[in-house]
Every structure is written in structure tokens, then in C-alpha cells.
């Protein structure tokens, strides 16, 4: 299966897997920007993609940025649909107490390619019951 990638900016880095067997391809910034505490910013990657049929790309945070700087992807996971051809942008948010400096060519997120199931939607008057039924939000303990 192939993922086609188009560079939109000379600073762009083609995403790659850091290690064999990794689920996520590293994504890189082409921007320099300061994200202040409590602030979110759209960071550009300078790439667009053409996904294989029946797939989506999920944009996920990098664990190191989250642990060390409290920087994460705001709309986790961000979804890139198979038919989208625009630039991939990453919305980063600073949950920390200090300003964070995004630099050009910094690893800012990861992209996981996964299969998508399409379903036929059917409106019904009643759903089947289960042992769990409507219990949620901590109903199995905290």
C-alpha cells in the first residue's frame, strides 16, 4: 500500500517511520512559532497527501512533547479523509506553564494510516439491550 506525498514548501520533510514497526509517521513543522500557556496554534507541515482507497490518516500527539512540555494535538485524533488534498496542518495546544517554541523542521505530531469502514445508516425506534445497557461515564468504577 502506498501513501503519495506532495511537498508544498521547500522546508517540508517527507514523513517517515522513526523505527521499523512504528505505527506513526513523524510529521514536521515548516513554521517557527511560540505557543504560550493555554494557547493553541495551527502549525503547517508543508505537505499534502493522497491516501490509499478505504483509509484515513489520524493525526496524534508525540508522547515526548506531551510529557516534557505539555504540548499536544488539540483535536486528537485529527482526521484526514481520503479525499482531502490540502496541506496538512496540526493544531497544537500548550497545557503547560511555560511558553513553547516550535522550530522549523521540528517533529510535532505523528500520522497513523488506518482502514475506514463505511456503514449504511438506519434510523430505528429501539436498540437491542445489553448487560451494560445505558451505563457509562464511570459506571464500572473509577
Curated annotation (Swiss-Prot):
<dbReference type="InterPro" id="IPR029054">
    <property type="entry name" value="dUTPase-like"/>
</dbReference>
<feature type="binding site">
    <location>
        <begin position="79"/>
        <end position="81"/>
    </location>
    <ligand>
        <name>substrate</name>
    </ligand>
</feature>
<keyword id="KW-0479">Metal-binding</keyword>
<protein>
    <recommendedName>
        <fullName>Deoxyuridine 5'-triphosphate nucleotidohydrolase</fullName>
        <ecNumber>3.6.1.23</ecNumber>
    </recommendedName>
</protein>
<keyword id="KW-0378">Hydrolase</keyword>
<dbReference type="GO" id="GO:0046081">
    <property type="term" value="P:dUTP catabolic process"/>
</dbReference>
<keyword id="KW-0546">Nucleotide metabolism</keyword>
<dbReference type="GO" id="GO:0000287">
    <property type="term" value="F:magnesium ion binding"/>
</dbReference>
<dbReference type="InterPro" id="IPR008181">
    <property type="entry name" value="dUTPase"/>
</dbReference>
<dbReference type="InterPro" id="IPR033704">
    <property type="entry name" value="dUTPase_trimeric"/>
</dbReference>
<comment type="pathway">
    <text>Pyrimidine metabolism; dUMP biosynthesis; dUMP from dCTP (dUTP route): step 2/2.</text>
</comment>
<feature type="binding site">
    <location>
        <position position="75"/>
    </location>
    <ligand>
        <name>substrate</name>
    </ligand>
</feature>
<dbReference type="Pfam" id="PF00692">
    <property type="entry name" value="dUTPase"/>
</dbReference>
<comment type="similarity">
    <text>Belongs to the dUTPase family.</text>
</comment>
<feature type="binding site">
    <location>
        <begin position="62"/>
        <end position="64"/>
    </location>
    <ligand>
        <name>substrate</name>
    </ligand>
</feature>
<keyword id="KW-0460">Magnesium</keyword>
<comment type="function">
    <text>This enzyme is involved in nucleotide metabolism: it produces dUMP, the immediate precursor of thymidine nucleotides and it decreases the intracellular concentration of dUTP so that uracil cannot be incorporated into DNA.</text>
</comment>
<dbReference type="GO" id="GO:0006226">
    <property type="term" value="P:dUMP biosynthetic process"/>
</dbReference>
<dbReference type="GO" id="GO:0004170">
    <property type="term" value="F:dUTP diphosphatase activity"/>
</dbReference>
<dbReference type="InterPro" id="IPR036157">
    <property type="entry name" value="dUTPase-like_sf"/>
</dbReference>
Amino acid at each position: 500500500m502506498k501513501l503519495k506525498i506532495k511537498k508544498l514548501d521547500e522546508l517540508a520533510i517527507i514523513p517517515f517511520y522513526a523505527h521499523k514497526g512504528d505505527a506513526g509517521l513523524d510529521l514536521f513543522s515548516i513554521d517557527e512559532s511560540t505557543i504560550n500557556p493555554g494557547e493553541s496554534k495551527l502549525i503547517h507541515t508543508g505537505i499534502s497527501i493522497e491516501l490509499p482507497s478505504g483509509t484515513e490518516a489520524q493525526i496524534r500527539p508525540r508522547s515526548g512533547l506531551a510529557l516534557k512540555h505539555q504540548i499536544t494535538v488539540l483535536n486528537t485524533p485529527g482526521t484526514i479523509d481520503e479525499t482531502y488534498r490540502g496541506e496538512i496542518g496540526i493544531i497544537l495546544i500548550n497545557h503547560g506553564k511555560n511558553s513553547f517554541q516550535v522550530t522549523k523542521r521540528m517533529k510535532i505530531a505523528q500520522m497513523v494510516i488506518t482502514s475506514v469502514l463505511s456503514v449504511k445508516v438506519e434510523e430505528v425506534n429501539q436498540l437491542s439491550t445489553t448487560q451494560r445497557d445505558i451505563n457509562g461515564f464511570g459506571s464500572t468504577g473509577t
